[in-house]
């Protein structure tokens, strides 16, 4: 059989469209997309024929059933959402690459109701007049934090930029050289400050800064004192950093506002659950910060948002800033954040309902029980692999507690019929996208970050891949 004969056997687009299998596909996919994929598959087959040498042509044929099957597979890939749910088996609780914090299961009904119907986003039901989208969060945030007012924008970098742009545009903002952090993706506090229109004044050194350094740098053009919580790194050894109360005293003396950027931000004292102490939002407000900014989608366990709390007189000005409209959040964020905040009224409920907090506060016995359960389920599969429970260490992630290693339990897998790297790739690329770790020539699943329903999914994929 020569190439000309093979080319002649390629079906036309119209012929494929008339195939019963393709007619069924039209019930699921737009016809224009089907035609596009058919043309791509025909062109792909044509290229394969062109690349054939004489010895290959004898065994090569055009199988229309295989072509239709390939068309269906490609349609599924093209039409699927690019943002996919996956399984986090890494043990990093707030994994910034894997969607950060998972939200509470129970809020999905609230979200769906707001998303699929009209809402009072900017409508005051009591008066029948235009309302403010920010009013929905004011009461709950005040109740939890004790702040006078709140404003929510789309992320914490935006929150910092809005705060500085409102309170200190064209003025100097004093901050410690040791707190000029990079928050990820090459976004740095000095760059955010420059974009806001404020002028950075660095004081102190990388490892030591004193309150007197701040005071010595004050001029008639000083707009604010800024403290940045270095949540994503630690300077240890010969160090000093002024306490927030000290900056408050200086702020009062010179009538200068004090701003603290907490970065991740927490509402609960994590040291009660065996983790290192992290300043809470409430701590910062009690110690005298006029304005505190933090994230909604890290330890807090809500959607991506930059939350600004503090003195009403400053937040009122921010609400009037033209930049606020460009940075504002939509009804989904407001709904998800309000629903998440409700759990924080009672700490025990927050720990139980918010996945991030639940994962971080598991007792070791609970972790051991989770590992034993998964180990037994995998053991019943009879797969050709060495599988066992080992001691491992989880991480908080999200730029918080970078030195914290939380004792955990992992399932280590060493397959007999393929390499560990091949197993990692197969699990990552499977339909359920299981993301684990390769450590010490073993594939490792940390049970801390697994949801109960994911155990069976993992077992099914291991059985499919390893046989």
Swiss-Prot record:
Modified residues (N6-(pyridoxal phosphate)lysine): 298
Cofactors that this protein relies on: pyridoxal 5'-phosphate
Enzyme superclass (EC): transferase
Catalytic reaction(s) noted: L-seryl-tRNA(Sec) + selenophosphate + H(+) = L-selenocysteinyl-tRNA(Sec) + phosphate
Keyword Cytoplasm: yes
Annotated GO CC locations: cytoplasm
Keywords, comma-separated and alphabetical: Cytoplasm, Protein biosynthesis, Pyridoxal phosphate, Selenium, Transferase
Pathway recorded for this protein: Aminoacyl-tRNA biosynthesis; selenocysteinyl-tRNA(Sec) biosynthesis; selenocysteinyl-tRNA(Sec) from L-seryl-tRNA(Sec) (bacterial route): step 1/1
UniProt xrefs under SUPFAM superfamilies: PLP-dependent transferases
Leader peptide range in chain numbering: none
Chief place where the protein resides: cytoplasm
Recorded superkingdom: Bacteria
Any one GO molecular-function label of the UniProt entry: L-seryl-tRNA(Sec) selenium transferase activity
InterPro entries: PyrdxlP-dep_Trfase, PyrdxlP-dep_Trfase_major, SelA-like, SelA_trans, SelA_trans_N_dom
Disulfide bridge partners, by residue number: none
Xref: PANTHER family: L-SERYL-TRNA(SEC) SELENIUM TRANSFERASE
HAMAP family: SelA (MF_00423)
Functional summary from the UniProt entry: Converts seryl-tRNA(Sec) to selenocysteinyl-tRNA(Sec) required for selenoprotein biosynthesis.
Protein's name according to its UniProt entry: L-seryl-tRNA(Sec) selenium transferase
Gene that specifies this protein: selA
């Amino acid at each position: 059989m020569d190439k000309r004969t093979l080319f002649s056997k390629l079906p036309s687009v119209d012929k494929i469209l008339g195939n019963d299998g393709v007619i069924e596909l039209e019930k699921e996919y737009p016809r224009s997309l089907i035609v596009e994929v058919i043309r791509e598959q025909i062109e792909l087959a044509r290229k394969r024929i062109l690349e054939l040498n004489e010895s290959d042509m004898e065994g090569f044929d055009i199988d229309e059933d295989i072509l239709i099957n390939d068309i269906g597979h490609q349609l599924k890939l093209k039409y699927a959402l690019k943002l996919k749910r996956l399984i986090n088996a890494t043990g990093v609780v707030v994994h910034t690459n894997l969607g950060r914090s998972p939200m509470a299961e129970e809020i999905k009904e609230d979200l769906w109701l707001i998303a699929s119907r009209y809402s009072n986003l900017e409508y005051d039901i009591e008066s029948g007049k235009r309302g403010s989208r920010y009013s929905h969060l004011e009461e709950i945030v005040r109740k939890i934090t004790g702040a006078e007012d709140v404003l929510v924008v789309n992320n914490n970098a935006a929150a910092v930029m809005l705060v500085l742009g409102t309170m200190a545009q064209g003025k100097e903002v004093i901050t410690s050289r040791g707190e000029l952090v990079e928050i990820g993706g090459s976004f740095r506090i000095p760059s955010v400050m420059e974009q806001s229109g404020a002028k950075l004044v660095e004081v102190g050194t990388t490892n030591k800064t004193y309150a007197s350094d701040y005071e010595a740098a004050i001029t008639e053009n000083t707009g604010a004192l800024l403290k940045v919580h270095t949540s994503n790194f630690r300077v240890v050894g010969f160090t000093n950093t002024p306490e927030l109360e000290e900056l408050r005293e200086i702020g009062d003396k010179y009538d200068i506002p004090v701003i603290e950027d907490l970065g991740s931000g927490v509402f609960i004292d994590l040291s009660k659950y065996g983790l290192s102490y992290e300043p809470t939002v409430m701590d910062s407000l009690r110690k005298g910060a006029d304005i505190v900014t933090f994230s909604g989608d890290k330890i807090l366990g809500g959607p991506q948002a930059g939350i600004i709390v503090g003195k009403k007189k400053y937040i009122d000005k921010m609400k009037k800033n033209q930049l606020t409209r460009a940075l504002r959040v939509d009804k989904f964020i407001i709904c998800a954040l309000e629903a998440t905040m409700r759990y924080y009224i009672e700490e025990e409920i927050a720990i139980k309902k918010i996945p991030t907090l639940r994962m971080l506060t598991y007792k070791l016995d609970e972790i051991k029980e989770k590992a034993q359960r998964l180990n037994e389920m995998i053991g019943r599969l009879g797969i050709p692999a060495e599988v066992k429970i080992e001691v491992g260490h989880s991480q908080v992630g999200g730029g918080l507690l970078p030195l914290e290693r939380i004792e955990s339990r992992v399932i280590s897998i060493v397959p007999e019929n393929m390499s560990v790297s091949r197993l990692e790739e197969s699990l990552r690329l499977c339909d359920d996208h299981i993301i684990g770790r390769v450590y010490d020539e073993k594939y490792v699943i940390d049970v801390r970050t697994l949801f109960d329903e994911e155990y069976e999914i993992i077992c099914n994929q291991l059985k499919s891949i390893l046989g």
